[in-house]
């Protein structure tokens, strides 16, 4: 479940698409996923389990260039390894995260 999605201030050094590792990781309930878009893009962020099944869709929207952070709550997910995937036009990247209970 997404708690909040908000643009954050972008530094001049942030050029190009970039997906950061979620923090904290591992986590029990709440984590933050940050990514940067160099241009206005159609963005989709999903969470999958270790079998590749989509367990949550965090966002599917057009976003302006800049840096963004999503606050993600894993309260409804069991303990385990999950992946978050960011797709923005021609960019696609994924990271692993660990949910503790």
Language-model features: where?
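Glycine-centered coil/turn sites that cap beta-strands in beta-rich domains
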Residues: 3-47, 69-72
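C-terminal tail/sorting-segment detector
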Residues: 2-8, 71, 75, 79-101
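Short, mixed charged/polar active-site loops
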Residues: 42, 67, 92-94
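Extracellular Ig-like/FN3 beta-sandwich strand-entry sites
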Residues: 40, 65-67, 77-81
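Residue-level recognition of short loop/turn positions
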Residues: 49-51
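Beta-strand-rich interaction surfaces with strong enrichment in secreted/lumenal proteins
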Residues: 21, 58-62
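Residue-level recognition of secondary-structure-to-loop junctions
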Residues: 37, 62, 74-76
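Surface-exposed loop/edge segments in extracytoplasmic proteins
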Residues: 53-59, 93
């Amino acid at each position: 479940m997404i708690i909040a999605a908000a643009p954050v201030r972008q530094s001049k050094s942030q050029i190009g698409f970039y997906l950061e590792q979620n923090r904290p990781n591992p986590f029990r309930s709440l984590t933050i996923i940050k990514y940067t878009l160099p241009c206005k893009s159609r963005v989709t962020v999903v969470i999958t389990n270790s079998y590749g099944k989509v367990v949550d869709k965090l966002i599917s929207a057009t976003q302006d260039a800049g840096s963004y952070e999503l606050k993600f709550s894993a309260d409804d997910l069991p303990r385990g390894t999950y992946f978050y995937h960011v797709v923005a036009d021609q960019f696609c990247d994924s990271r692993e995260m660990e949910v503790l209970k």
